[in-house]
Amino acid sequence: MVIALFIGWMGLPGSIPATKTNSLDWRVEEDGRLDYLISKPEFNLSEETVDANSSLIAVQFASRGAEIAGLLRIPKFSRTVSDEANDRDGIPGIVLLPGATVTKEREQGLAKRLADLGYATITLDQRNLGVIDVNADLELFLEGSEPIEHIMIHDALSAAEILRSVPEIDPERIVYAGESNGARTAIIACALDERSKGVLAISTCGYGTDAAVAQSGIEDEDTIRFYRSIDPETYLPLIAPRPLAMIKSENDTVIPYPLAERTFALASQPKSLVSVGCRVHGYCQEMDEGIEKGLKGMFS
């Protein structure tokens, strides 16, 4: 349903040759799976400030020709609900990706809640604040250039490498989390980052690309490959055996609950889908128990 809307917006494209769909560190496989070669980016950290139960540090890092801004939040204590014995030196970390139009500052309510549980987070101002233009990205891809949605995934992977370089954080206990479209990026990034321990996806779903393409009659292989490359459902087989924890309101005001159920059904175990009743799109306090349990399963 969702990807069908995208296809409707752009219409059926002409046969534009994909002259270049890979580079030394970026490629898209024939099945639509994106792949990146990631290394730790250059980054700068500001002076830390104390905010409630944690330290807050502004981050700037270079990624694919742009400067990306983030907020690093480190809890004052290292014990987490998943590490009751406190026998590890490092704090587990989360790459936290807001939904479209949401800034890193507005995402700090959830980041503070995660700090309460003992998790460090790095929250990004995503490119275009997470707003996507599928038509423009498709044109870029067919021309052989990187779409913005691909680069956003690169940004998330780079953020994970920054977390791994922070002395207080355990580099082997990193997960991805996101809300709405940020959760789609989080799922894909987790699939590509084999070192990560799982993904927490709030108020999201995949695009159902294969069914939508079949219904629309699109035959251009590169167009189909692009749509599959931005669909988190393409990457679900790469998540297991790491956990996928989905949390969704049955009264979500943007994404119907059955779409989340469809995506969840395509994932392999271990997986969980927690439903709540709040009438919002995105995080609400009713999700706290599911978040705590889902993260505990990733870090235990």
Each model region followed by its residue ranges:
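Cap/lid segment of the alpha/beta-hydrolase catalytic domain
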Residues: T101-H154, G208-G217
